[in-house]
Amino acid sequence: PYHYYPITGEMERNSLEKGTYVWKNPVPYIESGILLSEDGGETFKRRVAFRTTAEEMKKYGLTWFWPENTVAELESGHLAMLFRMDGFGRLQRSDSYDFGETWGEPFATDIPNPSNKPQLLKTNDGRIVLLNTPNDGKGLEARFPLEIWISENNMAGWNKKIVLSDFPGVYSYANGFIEGNILYLA
């Protein structure tokens, strides 16, 4: 998955001169999607799942936000993408039924999230694992608890929810991978 912000050299220089962050500059649009290769990784093409313009962001009082995404293949050709949306309190979702070539209109899920990047993983037996901080608060201080949710029905519901830590810390960008039957978390 990728997320893209068209930053110009001028915007970067402006940020450096002012001693501020590049995301303090307004951008014309922001997008999230996946990169597909048909030649073994020699070249890639972007497939956009979500794109919003500066005008749309202004409706919410934003000049910038982070639609960071994660993707899992639920069934052959059916991909589900979840992404965070600053200030919305819920993860957004988009689905593709053609291996990521095209994507459906994003919609809000019922999964709480305080604008923290989630991660989807698929187990060898087909279950979907979500690593998330399910809190609908805002800001870094809302990035807890850290939980694993497991779906046995392609994300139609979550059969098991495991609290890894409910300490009110800041669990940002939790990550993991599956090797064999073992789930590794960082």
Segments predicted by a language model, with ranges:
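Asp-box/BNR beta-propeller blade signature and adjacent active/binding-site loops
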Residues: 1-186
